Amino acid sequence: MKISTKGRYALRMMVDIAEHQKDGYVTLKDVALRQGISKKYLEQIALHISQAGMLRAVRGYQGGYMLARPASEYSVHSILQVVEGSMAPVTCLQQAEYKCERRDTCRTLPLWQGLEALITNYLSGITLEDVVEGRIPGPNLQ
């Protein structure tokens, strides 16, 4: 599994909005300038995230974006999942999209399931607020 540019930019956008929304709605123009990301690309990402109910959008003068809930209620995993879709490290774990004929006898399947669980648990345990506050824990590999 590789996090795409879209996923990385989505997380950066959400962090930026969380950091700056105390002064009101945050424009994508401002996010684009601060983050060095194309405004057009951010518009596509913001649309997906808004449709998922994670952002509130207001058009017009003094419009922009704001988190729909407190930053503490968004996990990094939930944000990435909106734009990335499946976070499975291998195709055979994307059940809805792919059925491997060897799934029932595959000796390596438990390895991939374990890796997926580590990734999911780690990213689910980090909130947007944690990222904003710089409280990103190292992975607990025990």
Model-derived regions: residue spans:
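Basic amphipathic alpha-helical segments that dock to polyanions
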Residues: I45-S50
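A short alpha-helical element within helix-turn-helix/winged-helix DNA-binding domains
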Residues: V26-G36
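Short amphipathic alpha-helical interface segments
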Residues: A10-K22
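Key DNA-contact positions within bacterial/archaeal DNA-binding proteins
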Residues: K40
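C-terminal regulatory/oligomerization modules of transcriptional regulators
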Residues: V76, Q94-Q142
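Residue cluster at the C-terminal edge of the helix-turn-helix DNA-binding motif
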Residues: Q51-M54, V82
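Beta-hairpin "wing" of winged helix-turn-helix
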Residues: M54-Q62, M66-L67
